[in-house]
């Protein structure tokens, strides 16, 4: 009897010790969701971001080549939407550093309270001499997202190395106390969890000082997600916020800060070594400098092009630093320009797009949202080369240091290519106008 008593006492004491600090697993709303990835400071650094609706006390990614034998940890921040309900969620970010180039990794995210499903991504090849493939679009909502299934299918077939979403998400991310934003991030997860999803802010992200955009996405910007750049293959990509020119209640200093940063970034991209390695410079932002739509006054507003009171206009920088292509959205349509500066066409030497004399502008804002596509003015402006109101998205390929290619996919026409463009350039430098 004494032996039985001692054994029972020992068992109880051991259980008490083991239970001290043990996980209770009582954590509702701790399942990871809204998973998406982006490039870090280098393209073999991948940032993985996701949400939970309770604090999991840890942010962990298990990953590897075929098997998940590695682990990385990060941090989580509490984001509270500015709406009436003040809904909150924990947004987790983990950085996977110094991955192997041109390698497929499998991963899942989570904590002791639960893991996501398994995803994979492929890091880009090292260096500049490889075929870069991208999907580009703007203005995609959680309703009427015509292009989403096509993009999901292409991503699953490994057609893209990067996705550029050129502003306006969900319509809007803050709607219904940010529930629409949550649903949109779930919808794009099949894309954004497998292909780096690079973004810029649009006018529909403005609410509460762009808080949903800034908190939900993790871009490699110097101070925030509002502007940044990254190098991929033979291309230097630059993302800017056109919205700092329109929502000045958040401070004119934002315009100055971005302008100064952009000038410095483009100057660095134009050093002989950098321009030799990555000759193509592509800038993207939400509101276009040029468009010919008739539904509102936006196409006649020139704040980003000429600046406020003639200061901090972005178009002269495009010329000074030889930006090759500028990509916009905002208008729910597709439009391609001839080489263009200050409303004047500067065609190339042997054809419009062979050694063009100015940047080419592309508007690709017809991915699909609850707002309809936007009609055009007639006749077309002299600088407008092609335009369409079909729902769709843009494919881009950078073949090498001299040739890049764009094509517009029409979802209305079941994936038919309705426009295509080769740009051939043998010397990348400031334009001589």
Language-model-detected regions and their locations in the chain:
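N-terminal signal peptide
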Residues: 9-26
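Metal-dependent phosphoester/phosphodiester hydrolase catalytic core
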Residues: 24-373, 385-387, 395-433
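Periplasmic/luminal catalytic loop of GT-C fold multi-pass membrane glycosyltransferases
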Residues: 377
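C-terminal structured "cap/appendage" subdomains that terminate the fold
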Residues: 380-381, 390-392
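Classical eukaryotic N-terminal signal peptides for Sec-dependent ER targeting/secretion
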Residues: 1-9
